[in-house]
Design a protein with these regions (language model features):
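Alpha-helical recognition segments enriched in aromatics with Gly/Pro capping
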Residues: 1-38, 53, 124-337
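N-terminal, positively charged nucleic-acid-binding surface of large information/translation enzymes
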Residues: 14-19, 23-111, 129, 482
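Short, well-structured beta-strand/strand-turn elements
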Residues: 65-67, 137-144, 472-474
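Short catalytic-loop micro-motif centered on adjacent basic/acidic residues
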Residues: 68-69, 113-117, 232-234, 399
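Short, glycine/charge-rich beta-strand/loop segments that flank catalytic centers
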Residues: 72-77, 97-101, 111-126, 143-155
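The substrate-binding groove and active-site-proximal loops of carbohydrate-active enzymes
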Residues: 83-90, 114-120, 207, 235-236
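Structural preference for alpha-helix termini/caps and helix-kink/transition segments
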Residues: 281-485
Length: 485
């Protein structure tokens, strides 16, 4: 059985794990609801992007050609509200926040998707889709004479199929707008308001306004992937009402739409969903202050199954750094032992990804609905066995376990090593290295100043912080040398 044929994914709509078979042999089409760029990213945003980046990478490792589309919602009530509160142009806010999201993705080695459409670039497609729904009797202009247009949920008997709800039992969380026929009807087109900027309104057959949130994703996904594609992904909090409404309007328009619906769990703080509205979130900037390298953040975000919620507390990155150091330690020990038998130790570290070197248990875990925690267990078992082999100087076993470890780390993109021209281990990216070096040098200088001022408690605290960054200090009479473990 090929590795491809062994892959299964959990479909949220059918509520079961199913064998994955793409619509087009050898190709995978994947649409993911990206961020609404109203403010800077937090841990939950990073996790969602990481999940689908890893999913895309695993499909590629299996030999598929992947088209990943992750949208950016750059027009929204909250964007307008936040821009007004900050006295800046809403388009400027959207651009600046989009840049912050991209910076966070880059630091976590999350690749740029095949396409990253802006909602505002697809207004014409949204209007065309709304007109189609009106023509089919599934949408109507508001009965109060405004430019609002609503999806008629009563016209679509399957409404509620994604979340297995009956319309009468739904807690409609769509905003209460005038002119609706039924409580669950949701906005496809929203009339502009006098207090909103003119640039946030577009001409339409129904009057000036802007698209509703749900219609945006239906238009962008079908524009870029067609009316029938393999997978639709997004956060668990988007299942209702966003994805429920998105599915209803797409199917009512006559589209087959997504074969699989995949939802990632949330990042919680003290058992509660991390969100900006609750003020209980940890920002991406805060995470990168704790881990400029970004590798421990990535490792931490992978420690729970993607469908499960992930708990955040102050010690999670320290735990992740310990695991990363365990990988580093084994690779260094193993390479030191086998280096004499290698033509080029640095070339060994730089070997291209080789799927055939992945242990069968690792492949089975990843093919089982992307079970990364089980895959990490296989990785750490290989490290344990490899360390034992190093202790026993079993060259062949060490070489085998080292090769497997490197390939597993590369598959998960938690590989802690690159090499310089001398074959010495260095940080994965020059950008991360420069940022980390700057932070370390500042902390070392602060510690020297604290010692000079006889503030030894402060000096010890800085030493602890440097230790958590994987830094070893060597004090001399007039200076401090440092190295990274």
């Amino acid at each position: 059985m090929s590795a491809q044929s062994g892959l299964s994914l959990y479909d949220s709509k059918r509520q079961q794990k199913l064998a994955f078979k793409p619509l087009v042999e050898g190709e995978v089409s994947l649409y993911v609801c990206g961020p609404t760029v109203q403010s800077a990213p937090h841990a939950g945003h990073l996790r969602s992007a990481l999940v689908y980046d890893l999913m895309s990478k695993w499909f590629s490792a299996l030999g598929y050609r992947v088209k990943l589309v992750r949208n950016i919602t750059d027009i929204d009530d909250k964007i307008l509200e936040n821009a007004k509160a900050q006295s800046i142009d809403w388009q400027q806010l959207a651009r600046e926040m989009s840049d912050e999201f991209k910076a966070g993705y880059d630091k976590l080695a999350i690749e740029t998707p095949s396409a990253e459409p802006l909602a505002t670039d697809h207004i014409a497609s949204m209007q065309k889709l709304i007109s189609l729904l009106i023509d089919k009797g599934h949408a109507y202009r508001a009965n109060d004479g405004s430019a609002n247009v609503y999806f008629a949920t009563l016209s679509w008997p399957a409404y509620g199929e994604l979340t297995n709800q009956k319309p009468e039992d739904m807690d409609s969380s769509d905003e209460l707008l005038a002119g609706k026929v039924a409580a669950n009807d949701f906005a496809l087109w929203k009339a502009s308001k006098p207090e909103e900027p003119e640039t946030a309104a577009w001409d339409s057959p129904w009057g000036k306004g802007r698209p509703g949130w749900h219609i945006e994703c239906s238009a962008m996904s079908t524009d870029l992937l067609g009316e029938h594609f393999d997978i639709h992904g997004g956060g668990l909090d988007l299942r209702f009402p966003h994805h429920e409404n998105e599915l209803a309007q797409s199917r009512a328009a006559g589209f087959e739409y997504a074969n699989f619906w995949v939802h990632n769990g949330l990042v919680n703080s003290n058992g509660t969903k991390m969100s900006k509205s609750l003020g209980n979130f940890v920002s991406a900037d805060n995470l990168f202050e704790q881990d400029p390298r970004g590798l421990a953040i990535r490792y931490y975000l992978l420690t729970a199954h993607y469908r499960a919620n992930l708990e955040y507390h102050d010690g999670v990155l320290a735990e992740a750094k310990t695991n990363i150091r365990g990988i580093e330690s084994f690779v260094k020990r193993a390479l030191s032992l086998i280096a004499p038998a290698l033509e080029s130790p640095s070339a060994f570290l730089q070997n291209e990804f080789d799927f055939d070197l992945l242990p069968a248990d690792f492949v089975a875990a990843m093919n089982d609905d992307l079970n990364v925690p089980a895959a990490l267990a296989v990785l750490h078992e290989a490290i344990r066995a490899g360390n034992s082999a190093v202790d026993a100087a079993e060259i062949n076993s060490v070489t085998e376990q080292l090769g497997a470890t490197i390939m597993m780390c590369k598959a998960l993109n938690v590989y802690p090593f690159d090499v310089n021209a001398s074959g010495e281990a260095v940080w994965p990216t020059a950008e991360a290295s420069a940022e980390l070096k700057s932070k370390i040098e500042q902390l070392v200088a602060d510690r020297l100043a604290a010692k000079a001022a006889k503030d030894f408690a402060r000096a010890d605290a800085i030493r602890d912080e440097l230790t958590n960054l994987g830094v070893t200090l060597e004090d001399s009479a007039d200076k401090t040398n440092w190295s990274v473990n």
